Amino acid sequence: MPSPSYNRHIIIASCFCCLLIFSSAARVPKASKKHLARVKQLLNDEAERHNTLIQSDSVTVFDDIQRNPNTGVHHDELAVNNADEYFQGDVDLSEQQVKIIEDQFTQGKREKRKIGRNPLYKKWDTRGPISFDYAESIPFQTRQKIRSAMLLWQQHTCLRFEEGGPNVDRLEFFDGGGCSSFVGRVGGTQGISISTPGCDVVGIISHEIGHALGIFHEQARPDQERHIAINYNNIPLSRWNNFQAVGENHAETYNLPYDTGSVMHYGPYGFASDPYTPTIRTLERVQQSTIGQRAGPSFLDYQAINMAYGCTESCADLPCLRNGYTHPNNCSMCACPEGLSGRYCEQVYPSNAQCGGVIFATKEVKYITSPNYPDKFPIDTECNWIIAAPIEGRVFMEFEGDFDFLCEDTCDKAYVEVKYHSDKRLTGARYCCSLLPKNRFISFKNEMIIIMRGYRSSGAGFKAKFWSNLGEPEGVSTPLPPTTAPLPEISETTQKPEPTTVQSTTTYTTAIPRRTAKKQFFTRKPITIPLTPLTSSSTTTESTTVSSTTQSTTWLPTEPSFATGETEITTASPTITLFPSLSTILPPINSLAGVLPSTQAPDIINSVLECGCGAWSEWQGECSQQCGGCGHRLRKRECKKEACRKEEKRPCNFSACPDGTNFLINNAEFHILWRGCCVGLFRSGDQCSALETESNPFFKIINSLLNIQDAKNNDTLIAKRMMRGEH
């Protein structure tokens, strides 16, 4: 006969299995509309008090901006959602989070945020991948886009995702009629609503995943008022809460700068009463068309997650240039801001057309243009330039001539971007549409980065002239900015040919296009590319009467080269770096400098294709239990591999069992009830629903019965039984 101790452990294990199964199967409920409305009213009241103090000073900054009637409306989550259903436009709150926020108002602790802090917002356990699933309401095409958005986060951070993984705390993508997510981990199965159509855009999905990982909206940072102004005169009073920041005691900015190019930033016309007047105005006027992009996470969005989850703590610090930092997926190279590449961000990112490169600015005016200017540039063009002045100089730039790109409120598909800040992590001023920018740009230091993108459309593009306030450097000089590690003196040998008249012919070398996630959903093996040395490659920089050629050797993947005909525009080959070589002062440069590392971030998203599984059957039979949320229905599929999941269960019959019912024994199942609900659920009226593990009173009792060794022994076994459907 089994001992009492043995029986006790069997009962405890059974209860724990029930807890795991049902806390993962039923999505965490959102706060009630009544409680959500109460929090919004508190925020509205505070916004009104704050606005009374500042409105007279800030309202004038909107007088000179009116929406171009020919501008297309930029699509984002706010265009899909009913604002009454969400906190800050697309954020779900649990009842516990609502209570904590209300308590903060009561206690007078109002701060601001970027990344969620405990106890209100929790981070995920990174000792393993984050488990996720899809509800039946998510179609196949949308699932592919969700995987693509996850790969963006996975390739640039240390976080990993696993489809159908075993964790109790997990994500479930479903169609809830809008685009929304909780912020951070809330415990159990938490939903991310991706409505189709409407939210099924990779950029919007990456925004909602960003929330789930713990990121708030960028415009709600503590330094908000130093970067943007809110036009409360153009926002209904009931929507003011969407522009307020929430406590610093709930969040951490990690001293990262404000980023107008964040995928988490509102667009300029969100919640506008008058659709032709913005609700958000960037104080740097040239950034107005930058805010609100939904192409994908920015460099600083990735860095925020890497810092929050300690992704580079196990790596040694590298002497990364231009505000790069050690790559979380490859400790031997740097993660580089947009437009830069190389092991230490010492190179310009390769372009995929006849454009880009590194060009020295002098007092003499030079030009760059989009490919084929003034004819149309090819669709999906990517160009990157570094314009460098002498070390103490500045770069000046102005646009002229025809200017033509796809026209939207936010420029995130086809545009030219000017990165003039000394901090190269910051997204620059973006311009699109057909109105020629009238600004003169001046770099903060001696470098300016120009980025041009032509996704989904074609147009004439741009022409820009640039120059420096100083002349050509005479001998040994480098435009490289100071690094985090001391560098020895750098020298360079330049061949100076005899003065001659320049022929207007430039030879280009095709560069490797930027890798994107859409063709790498389930790549598991490292990608390697054969390399060919390009010996003594040269680039010619035109001036009025003199040609100067700088020779260098660059390793790049083998690609054909081609020549262009005559052109009026000076440019440089995108594969040539005019900066001195760092090979003598730093470790050998990665032979794949300029593209993603050959040792790619491991892709551990499970693929139905790998398993060779067929379609799921319909849900079979009646629910195995009549009440309490304990029962389940079953569906099956055929798979080629035994290790793949062939059966799936989902809970059913969530009506509470009659009072006094303490357990259910039926259909070869045994379930313990807690107030009429299966363990892992809690009673709300006559229904059973999910409850966060940390708040579950029955879990606490179970936990107190287990000693430390019991927990260690049972943990893995229970998880395996769960996956086999043994409970």
UniProtKB/Swiss-Prot annotation:
Its cofactor is Zn(2+). Disulfide bonds join C158-C311, C179-C199, C355-C383, C411-C432, C611-C644, C623-C652, C627-C657, C639-C644. Residues 113-312 form the Peptidase M12A domain. Residues 610-658 form the TSP type-1 domain. Residues 353-469 form the CUB domain. InterPro entries: Astacin-like_dom, CUB_dom, MetalloPept_cat_dom_sf, Metallopeptidase_nem, Peptidase_M12A, Peptidase_Metallo, Sperma_CUB_dom_sf, TSP1_rpt. Glycans are attached at N330, N653, N714. One of its GO terms (molecular function) is metalloendopeptidase activity. The keyword Metal-binding applies. Its main location: secreted. It comes from the Eukaryota. Keywords: Cleavage on pair of basic residues, Disulfide bond, EGF-like domain, Glycoprotein, Hydrolase, Metal-binding, Metalloprotease, Protease, Secreted, Signal, Zinc, Zymogen. Expressed in the epidermis, the excretory canal cell, duct cell, pore cell, and excretory gland cell. Expressed in an oscillating pattern in epithelial cells with increased expression during the lethargus phase which occurs during molting between larval and adult stages. Not expressed in seam cells or in the RIS neuron. Residues 473-506, 532-561 are annotated as: Disordered. PANTHER family: DISCOIDIN, CUB, EGF, LAMININ , AND ZINC METALLOPROTEASE DOMAIN CONTAINING, ZINC METALLOPROTEINASE NAS-38. The TSP type-1 domain may be involved in modulating sleep behaviors. This is Zinc metalloproteinase nas-38. It comes from Caenorhabditis elegans. The gene is nas-38.
